[in-house]
Amino acid sequence: MNPVAFEIFGLSVRWYGIIMSAGILMGMLIALKEAKRLGMDENLILDLVIFAIPAGIVGARLYYVIFNWDYYSGNLLQIINIRGGGLAIHGTLIAAVITGLIYARVKKVSFWTLADITAPGIILGQAIGRWGNFVNQEAYGVPTDLPWGIMVNGVKVHPTFFYEFLWNMGVFFVLLWFRKRKKVEGEVFLLYVILYSVGRFFIEGLRIDSLMIGSLRMAQVVSLAAVALGAALIVYRRKKNIKKT
């Protein structure tokens, strides 16, 4: 598949950017719908998105560049070239959380409420965004003989982008079900962190393009830490809530 969708005045518009934009748009619409359901001012979510999107893109790129510094140290101008990919979701999430914390403090609203509202939209956006990896022929796995393998450079490989798409869609529907059953604020977001990280840990083990730190796959290290932190925060916040009541 041609990664270039069309050209405007000689400028190539790539499918990767179109798909990522579609993911962001769908995620935002889901968040706005959830804010309306909870009676929150939708402008609060729109303003948050305006700040979080550029912060997330910068965070995603910095994360990717840091763990590929051997290449980028000799190709500094390529650091700002993101049209062909090179964005790491963990960098996005870290930057988005920091942005959300600052935004919540400035607006004097609960960070955990904002996080719960945006969590389903975030995972839906991630699911859609994985198709950008398909177009770019990236984020695929090791060779396989399984019937659903895809051909990349003449080799049949695991479609790990598709595994993550399916997992993320499953997490999306779980969050929609759980949002009306949470015990305390923040649990929808923390469940998102846990479930996404569990899936990412196992899927990452099949990939051949993982960001590495020494001999370790960075995404697996971050995923394990995220599961532990998410679970600990759920337990802590539930106990804290019980003490208050």
What are these regions (language model features)?
Residues M1-T245:
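A feature for loop-to-transmembrane-helix boundaries and adjacent hydrophobic helices
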